[in-house]
């Protein structure tokens, strides 16, 4: 057998997988996945049977209910979705190497006969609001719109939910929260505003930053009320105080937040359609939104009538061709992003008349693991890890802003550096155990041994850590002016993760106002069109601070949902 269908048909009939009429159930393949589970068990049950494997692919870090067909195809060779981000060697039966041959929005515009046939037909569905993208912004918008009385469809072009949000690890920035007060952390929306503007080199839109900072506490409260654990509060680069909220023990915030959002969307019976791509925002003769043309992977083109459309499609950091055109210095860089982050939403918005801004500002995350392609959260540094070069020397304030940290790493021998930490840092942040499990964090019982393993000058490394520990004891980093010195590195084993910058966040995007309404080049609102999250520009300026992305997507997602629902009621 060359594929799963050929294998299954040796012992079973077609209707073991398919509906009796042979038609695919929907673009989410709901029926087909139910049949998979009926034979093989749930993802959790399968993960238990494969736990002996070095990389247990079924023990997924993805939120939501990951469908079997996210990786396993039937009538063609399968592709391991993990390989879209990582470079692990999975040996899956009937599989081929990961590839993404997805036509662009412009290329799809050439499907004129199919598109015109769909548009000439009656709408497939009629709702109040369509949300495009199932990341943190999309789910927040869908839930918020639903709670405001709107009927909502949420579409997602990938086979898995979560967008980039599911990969976020550091925290959710918010000011003057109950969690901060409980830890006696003094903060304010004004200070968060100042930090965000400074981090963005004051290119940010102050009005949008004010929305972000002044509503950040409400966003944390909103998530907490829905079941999120955001009790741990850490520090991220560019912040004056600890304001990065995350789960107890320092677990990754993104997957947790998306899981909470997903669970709440399910409770509200929100219509979620996977493998479904937003193609064109439809407008009437007056330029007002009347719906959206979509393309299902299996069902093809159809249109949905809606009063409002919310674009929450993320950025374009995975599209290196587009990145390099805007910033040639990033040509050939790998990305920390999920495979869908190629800029579809920007094309859809532009075709609808939306203006783009700040497109030239593209951020590299300083710590992408050289082995495995795993983004290592900034919280590792925030909790005490140091950065050293191959010569075993520190060379930068570890929790400076990402642009400065990335530039400093690229200036080192080999254009990479090493995160060095001990068991005390590991115990403070449960996310680190994931890196160890993935094999990207070698360990040794001495710094000399660790240096030998990783090609670092062990003698110099030992001296560097001793020097750093003395600075921790003194309470002041006179070498690089690191503002926080949470702990000495002298407990148990030592760890090293080789890291290099990877394209991480695209600060530019669709121009929006303080109601999340998309605007044209004349700064006029396009009635019924909204944007939230990384698809938009103006919030972060020239550089995004760690922890501000989750805050951004939740805050503006909520806002877009509320405003779209209000707009729908009026129309």
From Swiss-Prot:
Its EC number is 1.3.2.4. Transmembrane segments: none annotated. Its main location: periplasm. Keywords: Electron transport, FAD, Flavoprotein, Heme, Iron, Metal-binding, Oxidoreductase, Periplasm, Transport. Succinate binds at residues 170, 365, 377-378, 504, 544, 547. FAD binds at residues 137, 156, 164-165, 169-171, 278, 338, 505, 534, 549-550. Its cofactor is FAD; heme c. SUPFAM superfamilies: FAD/NAD(P)-binding domain, Multiheme cytochromes, Succinate dehydrogenase/fumarate reductase flavoprotein, catalytic domain. It is found in: Periplasm. Induction: By anaerobiosis and fumarate. Gene3D superfamilies: FAD/NAD(P)-binding domain, Flavocytochrome C3, Chain A, Succinate dehydrogenase/fumarate reductase flavoprotein, catalytic domain. Residues 118-571 are annotated as: Flavoprotein-like. Pfam families: Cytochrom_c3_2, FAD_binding_2. It catalyses: 2 Fe(III)-[cytochrome c] + succinate = fumarate + 2 Fe(II)-[cytochrome c] + 2 H(+). Heme c 4 binds at residues 61, 82, 85-86, 431. InterPro entries: FAD-dep_OxRdtase_2_FAD-bd (IPR003953), FAD-oxidoreductase_2 (IPR050315), FAD/NAD-bd_sf (IPR036188), Flavocytochrome_c (IPR010960), Multihaem_cyt_sf (IPR036280), Succ_DH/fumarate_Rdtase_cat_sf (IPR027477), Tetrahaem_cytochrome (IPR012286), Znf_C2H2_type (IPR013087). This is Fumarate reductase (cytochrome). The gene is fccA.
